[in-house]
């Protein structure tokens, strides 16, 4: 499998995942042209994308979904409530490209895909566990906390894109209005750097994992701080980096961490 966050951050998200015969995007939250260029930068063609999976209807996850589907005739997969919530924002989609995920499962060519509920302030937000044979990747961002269901999926994954959204002190003393700060810090908001480190401890089960920290706030975080905070949490608990697991940062404005395994 191949796993590559094309863009990851509060300003826009899209992740490329592939097997030998299947190529998909999870979210397309930037302009269509930007995502096209991101794919080209890793040697992929937009017209070869088999599907776009949508986690939820917020703009930083769907901005380019409609234009990419219309331009390249790409099917869009999401659950029913997410479709209802995003339909006006993404524009007219051809009937055969409207794919509703029922019962939290869909097969796309040789990918077995399970969606799992995440805690976020959207209609019916989902993370995805994407499997090919005995390999698995998970996308877990935009979540206020890790439920047991989420942990069960992340426990068995080889590669995980995990949210490390904000530094709590930067958020508390930053420019956001009080109501927005409360939302971000709530159970339907986003994981802080400290929360992310603790979440990794919860899923460190002896199976080596590559964890990519993503969906960083542009205002209330920066990569060096996120990485340092997460590693401090892991080091205090005796986790050995590059033995028990590896940790990398996703980039905001360009493709990063192209992983083939």
Feature map (PLM): residue ranges:
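Structured catalytic core of nucleotide-sugar glycosyltransferases
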Residues: 4-14, 57-61, 87, 113-115
């Amino acid at each position: 499998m191949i796993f590559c966050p094309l863009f990851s951050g509060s300003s826009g998200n899209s992740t490329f995942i592939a097997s030998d015969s299947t190529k998909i995007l999870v979210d397309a939250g930037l302009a269509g042209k930007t995502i096209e260029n991101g794919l080209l930068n890793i040697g992929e063609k937009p017209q070869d994308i088999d599907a776009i999976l949508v986690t939820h209807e917020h703009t930083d996850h769907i901005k380019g979904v409609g234009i990419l589907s219309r331009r390249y005739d790409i099917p869009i997969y999401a659950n029913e409530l997410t479709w209802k919530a995003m339909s006006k924002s993404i524009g007219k989609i051809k009937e055969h490209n409207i794919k509703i995920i029922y019962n939290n499962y869909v097969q796309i060519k040789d990918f077995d895909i399970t969606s799992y509920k995440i805690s976020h302030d959207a209609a019916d937000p989902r993370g995805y566990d994407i499997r090919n044979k005995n390999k698995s990747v998970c996308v877990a961002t935009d979540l206020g906390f890790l439920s047991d269901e989420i942990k069960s999926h992340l426990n068995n994954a080889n590669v995980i894109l995990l949210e490390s959204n904000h530094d709590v002190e930067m958020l508390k003393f930053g420019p956001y209005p009080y109501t927005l700060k409360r939302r971000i810090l709530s159970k339907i908001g986003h994981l802080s750097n400290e929360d992310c480190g603790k979440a990794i401890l919860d899923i460190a089960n002896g199976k080596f994992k590559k964890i990519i920290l993503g969906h960083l706030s542009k205002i209330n975080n920066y990569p060096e701080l996120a990485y340092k905070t997460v590693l401090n949490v892991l080091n205090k608990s005796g986790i050995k980096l590059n033995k028990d697991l590896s940790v990398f940062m996703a980039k905001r404005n360009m493709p990063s961490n192209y992983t083939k395994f």
